[in-house]
Amino acid sequence: MTNNSTPNVLFIMADQMKASILQLYSSEIGIETPSLERLAGEGVRFEHAITPHPLCVPARTSVMTGRYPHSTGCRRNETLMPENEQHAFRIWKENGFTTGLIGKNHCFIESSDLKLFDVRCEISH
C-alpha cells in the first residue's frame, strides 16, 4: 500500500485460551506477555468479546466472515469455510493489503482462498 494513512492490521486469534489468564486483562494468574501488552496499548483490545461457537473452526469462520456458524453452514470442525465465501482476508487482499497466515488454519482450504495469502506458514495440531 502506498497511502501512508492506511493502517497496518495484525489480527491475532488464539485457540483455546481464555483472556482471564493474561496480566493484560488484569488476571489474578497474571501471565506476562510484554509484546501483546505493547500491541494492545497501540491498537485495539477487545474487552467484551464472546465466542460465537465453542468449537475452533466455526468460531474462526464466524470471525472471518462476520456471520454466525448456522448462516455459513460451518457448525463443526469438519465443516470448513464454504468456497467463495466473503471474508476479511479476501476484502483486505482486494484492497491492496499484503496478507499472511501464520499458525493454525483449518478454515481456508480452497485454492482461491489460499492464493489470497502472500505469506503462509501453517501448523496443525
Residue ranges of predicted features:
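Formylglycine-dependent sulfatase
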Residues: 1-125
